[in-house]
């Protein structure tokens, strides 16, 4: 019997009278890597928000781990243990890798923290994926790839059964992407599910078991691996979405450089 980790059925979601998701249908199976290919950005933020937070729906049903967690007739506004990893890291830059993974997580209640003990707890996870990231390294010193891996480990340790990766391939090298894909497949074999959001159809077909094309807040087509490439028009639109992703990343880098320059200017001149 195929088990489902997520089902969004006929979901219509509004904000301020504006429909952001319209008759939205998606199903992700346990241990599946599901590819989501957005033609444009419309409705994406609403979709990601609804994954983690059971906001009031105009219509439809949301099931997580085969339990009804949200429906249009009533909503409890509770959270779901679903991790979302974006190109902009959510890790605390001024804390170490091990602190981000173990200390900054829901359910951690140990008041006296022994760094050595936490590092020993982390090591089996690093050994399993075959990646060497010094546990005591500050996140600010990590590469983008290492931050992605750290966020995946944090999600696994926290017990997330569904991990979403949004546009991560745009910002790492080809060899790093292959390593990330290997880690995703490893955890998928362990029963963890993934939604892999990418603007590249070829990448999705390489990694994912099934894929869906998202347009204007709707899923318009679902593909199996090996199915023909969709029409040219949607693919051209996906390229436009990819350019938008890259422009957002450049804007983030510019904002970071601006903040660092302001910090540098505000520092008092040291006496020689």
What name fits each language-model region?
Residues 8-11, 19-29, 60:
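Conserved beta-strand
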Residues 57-71, 75-78:
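Conserved ABC transporter NBD signature motif
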Residues 198-199:
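H-loop/switch region of ABC-family ATPase nucleotide-binding domains
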Residues 204-206:
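A short, surface-exposed alpha-helical micro-motif characterized by mixed small hydrophobic
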Residues 216, 221-259:
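C-terminal boundary and immediately downstream tail of ABC-type ATPase nucleotide-binding domains
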């Amino acid at each position: 019997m195929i088990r489902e980790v997520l089902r969004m059925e006929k979901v219509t979601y509004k904000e301020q009278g504006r429909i952001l998701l319209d008759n939205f249908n998606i199903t992700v199976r346990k241990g599946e890597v599901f590819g989501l290919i957005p033609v444009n950005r419309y409705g994406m933020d609403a979709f990601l928000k609804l994954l983690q937070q059971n906001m009031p729906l105009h219509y439809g049903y949301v099931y997580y781990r085969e339990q009804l967690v949200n429906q249009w007739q009533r909503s409890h506004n509770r959270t779901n243990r679903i991790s979302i990893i974006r190109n902009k890291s959510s890790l605390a830059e001024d804390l170490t890798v091990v602190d981000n993974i173990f200390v900054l997580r829901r359910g951690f209640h140990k008041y006296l923290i022994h760094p050595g003990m936490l590092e020993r707890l982390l090591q089996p996870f690093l050994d399993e994926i075959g990646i060497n990231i010094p546990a005591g390294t500050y996140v600010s010193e990590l590469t983008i790839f290492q931050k992605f891996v750290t966020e995946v480990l944090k999600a696994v340790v926290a017990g997330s059964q569904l991990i979403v990766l949004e546009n991560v391939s745009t910002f790492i090298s080809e060899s790093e992407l292959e390593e990330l894909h290997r880690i995703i497949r490893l955890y998928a074999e362990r029963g963890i599910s993934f939604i892999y959001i990418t603007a590249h159809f070829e990448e999705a077909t390489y990694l994912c078991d099934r894929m869906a094309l998202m347009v204007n807040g709707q899923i318009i087509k679902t593909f199996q691996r090996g199915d023909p490439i969709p029409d040219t028009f949607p693919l051209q639109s996906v390229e436009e979405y990819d350019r938008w992703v890259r422009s957002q990343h450049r804007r983030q880098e510019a904002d970071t450089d601006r903040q660092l320059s302001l910090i540098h200017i505000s520092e008092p001149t040291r006496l020689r």
